[in-house]
Design a protein with these regions (language model features):
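Sec-dependent signal peptide cleavage junction
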Residues: 215-233
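Conserved hydrophobic packing residues within short motifs/helices of P-loop NTPase cores
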Residues: 109, 144-146, 169, 192
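Structural microenvironment flanking redox-active thiols in thiol-disulfide oxidoreductases
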Residues: 120-162, 174-180
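Oxidative protein folding and maturation machinery
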Residues: 1-99, 104-105, 134-137
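Thiol/disulfide oxidoreductase modules built on the thioredoxin-like
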Residues: 164, 171-219
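Conserved redox-active cysteine motifs that mediate thiol-disulfide chemistry
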Residues: 103-129
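Signature tryptophan residues that serve as conserved aromatic anchors
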Residues: 112-115, 155, 166
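Loop/turn elements at helix/coil->beta-strand transitions in domains of secreted/extracellular proteins
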Residues: 102-107, 137-141, 163-165, 196
Length: 233
C-alpha cells in the first residue's frame, strides 16, 4: 500500500534529490512521479519543491500547468464549497445543484465516459448501481452522473447499455470540459461526495470505503432530522 516504508523511503529520496539538483530534469520527473501522481497529493509539499527549482525548470510549461492544477485541486479539496455547474440531461433540461431532485441532499457525483477503460467503468458502475438501489428512495442522498463524453450518441447508448438510472448530464467537452476543469478531474471514472450544503466531503472513495462513507452521511442526516422533529413537537 501507499504507506509501506518503501514508498515513504522513495519519497524521501526523491525529495532529497530535488533539493540537491535544482536544475535537473530528473527532478521534474521525480516531482511528478512521487508527489503529483498520488491519490491525495500534498500540495504544500509540492509547492515547496517547485520553489526550490531554478529558473530553467520553473520556465517549463509543465510547472505552469502544475501550478494551475494545484490551485484548482486546492479549490476542490475536502471541506471546500463545490463549484457551480449547469449541464443538460438527456431530455435537454438544465440540471444544477439546486434542481428539485438534488437540492438540500447529500450528492454523489460520478464522472465517467463511454471512452473510459471498460474494466474500470464496469467496476465503478457495479458499485454505483448497488448504491443507487439501496438509496434511490432516500431523501437524504441523490446521485448524478457527469459524463465527459464527446459524442452524444455514444453517451446515450452507454447510459442505456449500462442501465445508469440516476440523473445523467453531459456538455460534450471531454476532459477539457469546464466542469472537468472546475472539479480538477484528471481521469475517469472518479467521484466526489458533496454535503447537503454543497461542501466537498470526500473524493474518489472506492468499494467499501465509499459505501461506508455514504452510510455515515445518510445516518447522520436521519439522526439530525429526528432531533429537529423532536424540537418542533
Amino acid at each position: 500500500g501507499l504507506n509501506s516504508p518503501s514508498e515513504k523511503d522513495l519519497e524521501q529520496k526523491a525529495e532529497e534529490f530535488i533539493q540537491q539538483h535544482h536544475s535537473s530534469f530528473v527532478s521534474l520527473y521525480l516531482l511528478d512521479k512521487y508527489f503529483v501522481q498520488k491519490e491525495s497529493p500534498d500540495f504544500n509539499k509540492i509547492k515547496k519543491l517547485i520553489e526550490v527549482m531554478t529558473g530553467i525548470l520553473q520556465d517549463k510549461l509543465y510547472i505552469e500547468q502544475l501550478n494551475e492544477a494545484i490551485s484548482l485541486s486546492e479549490k476542490t479539496g475536502t471541506g471546500k464549497y463545490a463549484p457551480f455547474f449547469s449541464l443538460s440531461n438527456i431530455k435537454g433540461e438544465k440540471i444544477t445543484r439546486s434542481s428539485e431532485d438534488l437540492k438540500k441532499k447529500n450528492l454523489l457525483i460520478n464522472f465517467w465516459a463511454s471512452w473510459g477503460d471498460s474494466i474500470s467503468n464496469h467496476q465503478s458502475n457495479t458499485e454505483l448501481k448497488e448504491i443507487y438501489q439501496k438509496y434511490k428512495k432516500n431523501k437524504h442522498i441523490a446521485m448524478l452522473g457527469i459524463s465527459l463524453d464527446i459524442d452524444k450518441q455514444e453517451w446515450q447508448d452507454a447510459i442505456k447499455r449500462d442501465t445508469l438510472n440516476w440523473e445523467q448530464v453531459c456538455d460534450f467537452g471531454g476532459l477539457n470540459s469546464e466542469v472537468a476543469k472546475q472539479y480538477a478531474i484528471k481521469q475517469v471514472p472518479s467521484n466526489i461526495l458533496l454535503s447537503a450544503d454543497g461542501k466537498i466531503l470526500a473524493k474518489n472513495l472506492k468499494g467499501e470505503q465509499l459505501k461506508k462513507k455514504i452510510e455515515e452521511v445518510v445516518t447522520s442526516a436521519e439522526e439530525k432530522e429526528k432531533q429537529d422533529n423532536k424540537k418542533k413537537k
